[in-house]
Regions:
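Divalent metal-dependent phosphate-bond-processing catalytic cores, especially two-metal-ion Mg2+/Mn2+ enzymes
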Residues: 2-23, 42-49, 60-70, 80, ...
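Active-site flanking loop/helix segments enriched in acidic
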Residues: 31-60, 83-95
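His-Asp-centered metal-binding catalytic motifs of divalent-metal-dependent phosphohydrolases/nucleases
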Residues: 57, 72-90, 104, 126-133
């Protein structure tokens, strides 16, 4: 699923959220950044951690929005949380396989600064992304907890959907021996 196949609402939703967190660049520049993210989420090596995963996570953030402090910051963190991805064997062995939250946060920082998002907000987005790697947070960080719930919501599904998740994940890493 690339830019052409992405739902029509997806790119405008990205632009709205980035504007809502303080971006000063025009909508066209924000849209270009969103198109690049859609391309990153749509590479052929992503069998599970793809645009569908991003859309599902955004939907779960929307479900939790009333319980959060800043859902737009959470939405932007969703967009960037897995924008750097590798299923390379060496990356997997080093613990950076799949969605590389640390590299994704660095990408987000550069991109959001370029879009004119205030530095304090950029740091918050990046901290939410990095925290997804550990899934361990302070009890008083509601937005971080909600974002983790949105990310791990993949596991809280019916058995058939979970079976499909496992199948796609195995495809994503089919070049790595199971044992």
């Amino acid at each position: 699923m690339g830019v052409i196949e992405a739902p029509q609402w997806l790119l405008p939703a990205f632009t709205r959220s980035v504007k809502a967190i303080g971006a000063t660049q025009p909508p066209e520049a924000i849209g270009s950044a969103g198109e690049l993210l859609i391309e990153r989420w749509s590479t052929p090596d992503r069998r599970f951690h793809n645009l569908r995963h991003l859309i599902d996570m955004l939907a779960r953030v929307d479900e939790l929005a009333e319980e959060s402090h800043d859902p737009d910051i959470m939405r932007v963190a969703c967009w960037y949380h897995g924008c750097v991805f590798s299923s390379d064997v060496e990356e997997v062995i080093r613990g950076n396989g799949g969605e590389d939250e640390t590299a994704s946060a660095a990408f987000a920082e550069a991109d959001l600064r370029h879009l004119g998002v205030p530095m304090e907000t950029v740091k918050r987005v990046c901290s939410l992304i990095v925290n997804l790697k550990r899934h361990m947070l302070a009890d008083d960080d509601i937005d971080a907890q909600a974002l983790i719930d949105a990310d791990l919501g993949t596991l809280a599904v019916d058995p058939q959907t979970y079976t499909e998740y496992v199948r796609l994940l195995r495809e994503e890493y089919s070049h790595i021996p199971v044992e």
